[in-house]
C-alpha cells in the first residue's frame, strides 16, 4: 500500500480514518457516503474499470462523486467551499485497497 492509513474510534465510538493530505477526500467518501454500509456498490464500479469491462464509471453519493478511470480516480467534494480544494486524485487500485480495508474495519468493529 502506497499510503499510510490509520483506522481508529473517536471518543463517541465512531469508526474514523486518517489518511495523507494528498488524498484527504477519502475521509469524506468513507464517513459521508459509504459510512458503515460497506462499499460494495463503489467496489463493483472500480472492479468494472480495473477489469477493463468499462473505461470510465461515475458514482455520486451524499457528499462525493467518484470519477473512476483505470489508472486514477478523481474524488470530488460536491459541497466544497470556494476556499477549499474540491477534489483529489488517487490511484484506482489504491482506492480499492482502502475501501477493502474500511470494510474489514467495519466488519471487525461490529463483530466484536
Predicted regions and their residues:
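Extended charged/polar low-complexity repeat regions
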Residues: 102-105
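Short acidic DE-rich linear segments
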Residues: 107-112
